Amino acid sequence: MNVVDSSGWLEYLADGPNADFFASSILATADLLVPTLSLYEVFKRVLQQRGEDDALQAVALMQQATIVELSAALALSAPRISLNDKIPIADSIMLATARAHG
């Protein structure tokens, strides 16, 4: 299973210089997990930069994969990761999600 960080989604959606790096993981929807936090972050950024229609299209693409809710277990695992690895909350939630799903 793969988890693509929100920055990876945004790079892919913008067809940025590193979009190809993320494309194979994003297009393999059967093996892709999308934390709900990623939905929030991507929707917000695309809404801000390109408008609601593009933002809705972005999250529609994301929802073709398996959506992972922020469960109590993930919410309690992420702070430990954040403190141990000295990373921000969003990154620790992404990492906790990836670790929880193998």
Describe the role of every protein-language-model region.
Residues M1-V34, V46-Q57:
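Short, well-structured N-terminal submotif of metal-dependent ribonuclease cores
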Residues S6, A72, D91-S92:
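Conserved glycosyltransferase catalytic-site signature
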Residues A19, L39, A55-A58, S71, ...:
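A general structural signal for well-ordered alpha-helical segments in protein cores
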Residues T29-L32, Q63-T66, A100-G102:
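Short active-site oxyanion
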Residues T36-L37, D91:
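Short secondary-structure boundary segments
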Residues V42, P88-G102:
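Acidic, metal-associated active-site segment
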Residues Q63-N84:
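Acidic catalytic patch
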